[in-house]
């Protein structure tokens, strides 16, 4: 992903029936690694904007697209969890790709105990090197510790808890934990501090300050904005007004 912008909007418009225009010709480009807080009154189109960026809303005017190859992650107001899995099972979805790398590395190592030609050996060693590099790039050897820290910091329910019995706030914390572990290039957060205690908010702020990707967060939390956002995007009467934060 070598594009200048991670997300681009050109003349973005959205109308809800019968004739409520919430976004009126927005032109914006988002830099990789930027931390952006989205402000606006209720009904200003903040959630709609994030849903368009997340691909949840696909009917709109104008153009909007993410950079080629960019991974986009979205925390909705009412996120979806897999009811067939417990808390840990849902959180583990966030590290599925990392787990797959570790599994593949073990499979490759097992091959070295099998008879093979010199050519086959070269291929196996080359793949081992590629997988090793991918593992090192995401610090996969520490995945269990990383997962434990995130679950503890966000005060998640017990790992074996039935997600269908969780409160709305508990479900949001599980979904947020899963999303952060996925490490998307573009992280879209709709009121991420809702249902978090002060210590969890402080951990989240620190995590997002160091987050390598782009963060776009809707929030009413002024302290969160001060501590995380480099830019503010204010939505007012369908228009978007970006300005530099603290």
Model-derived features with residue positions:
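ABC ATP-binding cassette signature C-motif
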Residues: 1-246
């Amino acid at each position: 992903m070598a594009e200048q912008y991670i997300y681009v909007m050109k003349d973005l418009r959205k109308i809800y029936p019968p004739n409520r225009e919430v976004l009126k010709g927005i032109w914006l480009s988002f830099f990789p690694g930027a931390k952006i807080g989205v402000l606006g009154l209720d009904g200003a189109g903040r959630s709609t904007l994030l849903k368009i960026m997340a691909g949840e809303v696909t009917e709109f005017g104008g153009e909007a697209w993410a950079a080629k190859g960019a991974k986009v992650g979205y925390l909705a107001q009412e996120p979806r969890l897999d009811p067939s899995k417990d808390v840990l099972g849902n959180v583990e979805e966030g590290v599925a790709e990392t787990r797959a790398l570790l599994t593949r590395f073990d499979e490759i190592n097992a091959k070295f105990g099998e008879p093979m030609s010199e050519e086959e050996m070269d291929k196996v060693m080359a793949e081992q090197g590629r997988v090793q590099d991918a593992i090192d790039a995401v610090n996969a050897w520490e995945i269990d510790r990383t997962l434990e820290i995130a679950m503890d910091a966000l005060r998640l329910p017990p790992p074996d808890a039935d997600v269908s019995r969780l409160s709305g706030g508990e479900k949001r914390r599980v979904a947020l934990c899963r999303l952060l572990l996925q490490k998307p290039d573009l992280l879209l957060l709709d009121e991420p501090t809702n249902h978090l205690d002060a210590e969890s908010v402080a951990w989240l702020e620190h995590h997002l300050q160091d987050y390598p990707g782009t963060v776009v967060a809707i929030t009413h939390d002024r302290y969160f904005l001060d501590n995380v956002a480099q830019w503010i995007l204010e939505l007012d009467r369908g228009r978007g007004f970006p300005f530099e934060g603290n």
